[in-house]
Amino acid sequence: MASSVRLVKKPVLVAPVDPTPSTVLSLSSLDSQLFLRFPIEYLLVYASPHGVDRAVTAARVKAALARSLVPYYPLAGRVKTRPDSTGLDVVCQAQGAGLLEAVSDYTASDFQRAPRSVTEWRKLLLVEVFKVVPPLVVQLTWLSDGCVALGVGFSHCVIDGIGSSEFLNLFAELATGRARLSEFQPKPVWDRHLLNSAGRTNLGTHPEFGRVPDLSGFVTRFTQERLSPTSITFDKTWLKELKNIAMSTSQPGEFPYTSFEVLSGHIWRSWARSLNLPAKQVLKLLFSINIRNRVKPSLPAGYYGNAFVLGCAQTSVKDLTEKGLGYCADLVRGAKERVGDEYAREVVESVSWPRRASPDSVGVLIISQWSRLGLDRVDFGLGRPVQVGPICCDRYCLFLPVRDRTESVKVMVAVPTSAVDRYEYFIRSPYS
């Protein structure tokens, strides 16, 4: 039986505690791209200390939110499409971020497993209660065992993963009183013009935006068949084993692979094998690559807009499944190495109006690496989170941190129900 979640207070809009500029800010070409018209939604679960005062904790969170919105005042604004439809703006008039408080009969241990359905945890962030959803919504939910779940939703077109983690760590530090706003680093930087179109016309090939034939009813399967969430943790020993397997099946002279390269390759290969796709079906693995220090000059510290492009590894089902883990890891490495300043600038041009390039969904698996964002350090005075994950586990594959095990990675992804047993078998059988 699904657990219940019930609001205990009327939802409120929290405005910045101090006056902030009343203005309209333009989002960058990367921010405005069609691919990012969705929210980033985190679920942080805390083992609350015995005897915590709920009223005091909720008041502290609300006050810290109001203070953190002063330097991050666009998160209290509202996103709108420009009159000429060339991109997005943020109207900043201190309208406020959303704040909710709820109770639930979930316990912290319920979040150690995968959810039973894609949307099982949806009510832990009830954004739909707001007529116009703010760029930031926070929900504090008290669990039946005394623990706490914090759901946080960001408008992805306003902020990226790195930026959202920097905001959350500031928000948490202010809630505990461990830091003053004036002392916190890095200071948030807007400067979205740095990733705007420069009007280039000669653009290279970008496979992430290319279309491939659907030979297998791929789109129909992922839209019509029920998806089953999975959750598997890879520890240091398992990751080392994957690296050894990859090296044993790679070309002579290859440098040792990173954990990301082998884990991404293994997940991709296992996912592909589980789906029983035609041998000639072309598959893509897309993953975000931070360009803050890849563009020239580098973006300023504290830039919290979208500063990533998609790395793209591409091959056929036949090659992906037959050539071994080393081949897969090489494809991931090659996709990473292609991204430099020129590549990033071409992506900016490609996603800008009027081109508006966007990835297709045919044959695509997308990986997002949350394990390196610092979400496991977000402490509101309740200790570090015991679980970090998504509000909804869907076909986006997430790499998540594991508490007190910095070299371990939890992998969550939802796959078609007909393939879930095969997927979990191949994940646990890397030599097969």
Swiss-Prot record:
Catalytic activities: 2-(methylsulfanyl)acetyl-CoA + butan-1-ol = butyl 2-(methylsulfanyl)acetate + CoA; ethanol + acetyl-CoA = ethyl acetate + CoA; butan-1-ol + acetyl-CoA = butyl acetate + CoA; butan-1-ol + propanoyl-CoA = butyl propanoate + CoA
Tissue: Expressed in fruit.
One GO BP annotation of this record: alcohol metabolic process
Inducers of expression: Induced by ethylene in ripe fruits.
Gene Ontology MF: a single term: acyltransferase activity
EC number: 2.3.1.268
Statement: the UniProt record of this protein carries the keyword Transcription: no
Enzyme active site: 156, 379
UniProt keyword terms in alphabetical order: Acyltransferase, Transferase
Family the UniProt entry places it in: Belongs to the plant acyltransferase family.
Function: Involved in the biosynthesis of volatile esters which confer kiwifruit flavor. Alcohol acyl transferase that can use a wide range of alcohols as substrate to produce esters. Exhibits acetyl-CoA:alcohol O-acyltransferase activity.
Name recorded for this polypeptide: Alcohol acyltransferase 9
Species the sequence originates in: Actinidia deliciosa (Kiwi)
Classification lineage: Eukaryota, Viridiplantae, Streptophyta, Embryophyta, Tracheophyta
